[in-house]
């Protein structure tokens, strides 16, 4: 529940910030009449992401067992790529995102008689990017943790992001976005490492990967996945009490370079924004 909550809080807050920045810029430049058009783009993006998520989830439920495992592995790999890209992309562009959005709004509203649709599509693509990232991560998370709690956590995270977005827009709160994205990004890298190890496990169960399947270690006597804390670790970080050598290797092969890249100072002009 906690991982879907955090991911949807982060992704939802990114989308809310995009919408808030666009709406504020439209009002500040005496173009508030276009805010309604902006919301059309937001709703279209939300509908696309929701529809795609439902379609993929319902379709894959009919797959045979091996194909289901293969699909789970592919989705996990896609989720790892998206989460990693999300972490480092936000780290790179967060300082300039406001200027980029304002320039995109100006460009959209200068396109002759079709500027309304241009604004709709600009907002649509900006919000849909965040939503599609969430779709693939949630598909991977729901496959690892079956039950009502992951969807509930995702909905609570999204609802919290919406509330925070409105408060930021109205000026009711100031949030240190630099610290928020820094610490959630670090957490997400550990989540992605667990997904990468889970992908190898899924490919083995699908019959595609049968190398290095010896048990690396057995922690069942110390931290069983049947215990409360073990269950939480499994749901959040993909913890396995008796992982294979290949799972442990993939976990380290992904996480160590990712952490090194993360702790290195960003290049000039790519530091995180401090607050909004």
From Swiss-Prot:
Q: Where can this protein be found?
A: Cell inner membrane
Taxonomy, superkingdom: Bacteria
Q: Transmembrane ranges?
A: 2-22, 35-55, 70-90, 119-139, 148-168, 180-200, 245-265
Molecular function GO labels: ferrous iron transmembrane transporter activity
**According to its UniProt record, where is this protein mainly located?**
membrane
Keywords, A to Z, come to:
Cell inner membrane, Cell membrane, Ion transport, Iron, Iron transport, Membrane, Transmembrane, Transmembrane helix, Transport
GO cellular component labels: high-affinity iron permease complex
Subunit structure of this entry?
A: Part of a ferrous iron transporter composed of EfeU, EfeO and EfeB.
What family name appears in the similarity comment?
Belongs to the oxidase-dependent Fe transporter (OFeT) (TC 9.A.10.1) family.
Q: Which protein is depicted?
A: Ferrous iron permease EfeU
Origin species, per record, is Escherichia coli O6:K15:H31 (strain 536 / UPEC)
Instruction: Give the gene that encodes this protein.
Output: efeU
């Amino acid at each position: 529940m906690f991982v879907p909550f955090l991911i949807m809080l982060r992704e939802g807050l990114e989308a809310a910030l995009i919408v808030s920045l666009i709406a504020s810029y439209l009002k500040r430049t005496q173009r508030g009449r276009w805010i309604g058009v902006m919301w059309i783009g937001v709703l279209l993006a939300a509908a696309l992401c929701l529809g795609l998520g439902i379609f993929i989830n319902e379709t894959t439920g009919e797959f045979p067992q091996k194909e289901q495992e293969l699909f789970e592995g592919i989705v996990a790999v896609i989720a790892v790529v998206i989460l990693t890209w999300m972490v480092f992309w936000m780290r790179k562009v967060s300082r300039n995102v406001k200027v980029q959005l304002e320039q995109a709004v100006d460009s959209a509203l200068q396109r002759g008689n079709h500027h309304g649709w241009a604004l709709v599509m600009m907002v649509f693509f900006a919000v849909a990017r965040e939503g599609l990232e969430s779709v693939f991560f949630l598909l991977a998370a729901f496959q690892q943790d079956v039950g009502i709690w992951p969807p509930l956590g995702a909905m609570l995270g999204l609802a919290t992001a919406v509330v925070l977005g409105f408060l930021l827009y109205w000026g009711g709160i100031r949030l240190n976005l630099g610290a928020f994205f820094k610490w959630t990004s670090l957490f997400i890298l550990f989540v992605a490492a667990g997904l990468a190890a889970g992908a190898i496990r899924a490919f083995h169960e699908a019959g595609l990967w049968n190398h290095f399947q010896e048990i690396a270690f057995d922690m069942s006597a110390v931290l069983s996945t049947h215990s409360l804390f073990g269950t939480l670790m499994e749901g959040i970080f993909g913890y396995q009490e008796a992982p294979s050598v290949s799972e442990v290797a993939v976990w380290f092969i992904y996480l160590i370079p990712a952490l090194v890249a993360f702790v290195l100072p960003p290049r000039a002009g790519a530091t995180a924004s401090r607050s909004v």
